[in-house]
Amino acid sequence: FKQNPEHFLAEASRLVKEQKASVIIEKLSYDPTNESYDVDIFTAEQKITDMTKAVSGVNKHIYDYVVVDSQGIERDFVTELDTSKEVVVYAKLPRGFLIPTPVGDYNPDWAISFKEGSVKHIYFIAETKGTMSSLELRGIEDRKIECARKFFEKINAEITSENVKYDVVTSYSKLMEVVSG
C-alpha cells in the first residue's frame, strides 16, 4: 500500500467488483423473451475481417474460411473440426452474438452441430481456452462463463426440445469427451 497506493486502490476495487459479481451471479436467472438475432450478424462483420487471421480451405464451416482469435489453439481446433467425421457444420460465432451478463456481455466462440447418433449432444456451443484452470482465467471472464452456463440451462429447460450443450474446452479431444458423455 505505501509503495504504490494507486495500484492498491485499483486492485482492491477490482477484487470488490469481482466479489460483488459473484454474489449477483449466484441469484442470476435468465427469462426468455421474444427477441431473436437477425441473420445479418453473420454477414455484417465479413466486410471488415482481418484476413491475416483467417484459415482458408475449410469445408464444414459456414464460410470457406474461418477468422480465428489465436493462431495456436483455435487454428488447431478448426483443423480438427473440419476433418472430423462427427461434425456436420460449425461456425465461429460473430462478435454481435452476445449473452448479457451482470459483468458485461459475453461472446462464446463456436456453434457446432454433430451428426445425429454419433454423440450424445448434437448441438454444442463452445468456448475455447488455452487452460481450464479458473485461477488462470481472469475473474470477470470466469464470471461470464458462469453466466453462460445458466443461460444455456434456461434455454434447454424452457425454449428448445433439442438440447444445446455449452462448455469450455481446451481442445477437440476435450470437446468430444464432453459431447459423448
Per-region residue spans from a language model:
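Intrinsically disordered, low-complexity, repeat-rich regions
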Residues: 1-106, 113-181
